[in-house]
Amino acid sequence: MPWIQLKLNTTGTNAEELSDALVETGAVSVTFQDTHDTPVFEPLPGETRLWGDTDVIGLFDAETDMKEVVAILEHHPLLGAGFAHKIEQLEDKDWEREWMDNFHPMRFGERLWICPSWRDVPDENAVNVMLDPGLAFGTGTHPTTSLCLQWLDGLDLNGKTVIDFGCGSGILAIAALKLGAAKAIGIDIDPQAIQASRDNAERNGVSERLELYLPKDQPEAMKADVVVANILAGPLRELAPLISVLPVESGLLGLSGILASQAESVCEAYTELFTLDPVVEKEEWCRITGRKK
């Protein structure tokens, strides 16, 4: 069904309070948007870090009397009579279908294709990973995922064990298995990611070779020939002592989810135990790889 959107501008400090006000007047959802497209990276767990100048956007049912909503909001101490706002009618769309229509097969490296499960593969002789990531997890379109997939495609993974630290949709672990790895282990803090990875592994016929764990359940003394972690620079630095022990001696490490400007600080956290390769950049992101000393 169609919706009505009400947008108002405020400071990051007041955004949460105005979000509550919109919900109280009938908004079915509220989102925050940066007015000036200023990036904010790595909020702490449980933290909603907002921009200094923030648009607060409420979504209302199409039958909502928006004049009444505005009249109520005018009594809010942060707004007042005649407060600046924009009301817009949104056309009805099947958002999931629109997203599916825009997700096409993509090639990474020489052998690997990531293909939506609802599309035909472009090359039946290639290494094809059939992916149904849902709306929340990786599809290969982000530069960091692409960097990791290209790295895996260039490795000889035959008979190897691979750990995907922060597995999301399972795209990296499953790609490793399809590229010849004997076993892959996926770890993620989100139970939905574990389920998405499990579903995608079954779709690709590799579920018997993929182990999936929440951090609290992962076995002690886990080791792998190859470890890949596509998360964020902050966690990569903080978890360096944990991640660094996962590769076997002379094992390989691949890290991404890192802005190019953050590469040096991440390298510093791993250089003691790894011989690092030159950093590879794509757009504003980068990949760090190395071998265990």
Swiss-Prot record:
Record-level GO cellular component terms: cytosol
SUPFAM superfamilies per record: S-adenosyl-L-methionine-dependent methyltransferases
Keyword Transferase assigned: yes
The residues that the entry says bind S-adenosyl-L-methionine are: T145, G166, D188, N230
Cite the entry's keywords alphabetically: Cytoplasm, Methyltransferase, S-adenosyl-L-methionine, Transferase
**EC identifiers of the protein:** 2.1.1.-
* Record function comment: Methylates ribosomal protein L11.
The similarity comment for this entry is: Belongs to the methyltransferase superfamily. PrmA family.
The record, for PANTHER family, names:
ELECTRON TRANSFER FLAVOPROTEIN BETA SUBUNIT LYSINE METHYLTRANSFERASE (PTHR43648:SF1)
Official protein name in the record = Ribosomal protein L11 methyltransferase
The gene name reads: prmA
